[in-house]
Amino acid sequence: SLCQALARRARKAGAEVYRNTPVTALTQHKDDTWTVHTEKGDIDCEVVINACGYRVNEVGAMMGVQHPVASMEHQYFVTEDIKGIVDAGHRMPLLRCPISDYYCRQEKNGLLIGFYEQDCKTWGMDGIDPHFTNALCPDDLDRITDVLEGAFARMPALQEVGIKNVVNGPITYTIDGAPLVGPIPGKRNAFCIIGLRAGLGEGGGHGWLLAQQIVHGEACYDTWCIDPRRFGSHTNVELTALKAIEDYQNEFRFHFPNEHRPVGRNAKTTPLTPILAAEGAHFTVVNGWERMEYIKPTADFHVIHGFGFDKSFNRVAADVAAVQTNVALAEVNGFNRFEITGA
């Protein structure tokens, strides 16, 4: 497997790999080095990396950190052989259907079909069984009935074959759908590479960028979009779970520029927020803060998001012109504020 190949190359480079060795605690010392405590003894190291998948917050708790990562149950099944595939003489194309929320690819002489159902479930929010290793969740095909109808309509051959096996397991989500790769906020010599939905496919590139940050202090590219420090203290467990559900439900939907989805809004407001709302303000969100973008000309003013300029462009332009030529007041709640005292 890929994991074994990576471990083999790591050993050749001098790494030590410990299997079946549960970590029980992490201790950071005054010189910022770490001791990893395991059931088989302690390991002293300079740097600790949290790359623990769905156990991210168990390890985070050992550092005193709560990461904005939640797990969702995700199901797919593999069919028995399909005659049309056996006789085709070529591989079937990968299919992703944003209307019915499923994806499909050939698996031997059958099909593997995965689903992003609206009736989705978080996983492990109340703790994870310590013995849940190389394990799966119970099947729950009733939850994906509505999605199955779309798949059957698109591929009638599915109704003529049986299901060979069903897989239901946890995958991780962050608040904005992007992973957390880089230094852990508030900790020294501590990094993470977590919140990846497809570690097998994403691990190589993200691991390369993380290695550069650890060795050189920064990566060769701007990595702010995956930096763990991009989230503030408002990203609690409840908000993380709600945003994970929203992201799962919108897996195959475009996220347009300037689109801010409704879940988890009003996490941070000021006394001016309801006053501006009463004046017809349209709000965006910046690090949890509700920030006014423009004043709607009418109560029924509605913007349809896309990749071009929308109706809000002229509204913002008018506000900019007014500020340039007149005196204006603006609420800047999303900016940093520093209190400096002393001589």
Feature annotation, model-predicted:
Residues 66-69, 96, 217-222, 282-283:
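A short alpha-helix-loop-beta-strand transition element characteristic
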Residues 1-47, 204:
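Helical element adjacent to the flavin cofactor pocket in flavoenzyme catalytic cores
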Residues 41, 54, 84, 109, ...:
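Short, glycine-/Ser/Thr-/acidic-enriched flexible segments
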Residues 17-19, 50, 113, 162-164, ...:
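General beta-strand structural signal in soluble alpha/beta enzymes
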Residues 5, 99, 108, 122, ...:
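C-terminal catalytic lobe of FAD-dependent flavoproteins
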